[in-house]
Amino acid sequence: PKDLDASEIEVRLGATWIDKEYIQQFMYETFNTPFYLQRSIEVNYSSFTAEWQIKGKSSVSYNDVAAYTTYGTSRANAYKILEDSLNLRDVRIYDTIEDADGKERRVLNAKETTLAAQKQQTIREAFKDWIWKDPERRQTLVRQYNEEMNSTRPREYNGSHITFGGMNPAITLREHQKSAIAHV
């Protein structure tokens, strides 16, 4: 098939064909990760479990505005939300309560979950804006996508060579009808 242009490729956060270095670069740039934390916070992808993991996501200080306010909440920082997004999971915030029997159980906190879901959508939109901005990255990703993912095209059937002996000569089949017969 013909190569696709960047405008024709939809890239979602969590796409496994995107190299983890790009995800990590997006994370550092978007969340303004301090240089001293960049060594401890890193993105990993396991092809065996098909799971993304952000190592060191809890080492971020609570006074980090990007991680806990702009792209995260007080209950789920931006790195945790990004990890859920990479694994194609909706972020959920639970509270632990004690029931009448004295057993602890987890209950979904709807208000905090809604707030975290809004932050998750903000991160997804930021990624869509960021991924194609750099011309060099754009060129590399378009080439990679076309080589790895854009390799299948629908078959085209041509029945123009088929003849039908014994068919009524008054009936002539159209090209699409012959192609449909070739398909079968």
Model-based region annotation:
Residues 1-151:
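Charged, low-complexity intrinsically disordered regions
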Residues 139-143, 147-184:
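Conserved pre-motif I regulatory segment
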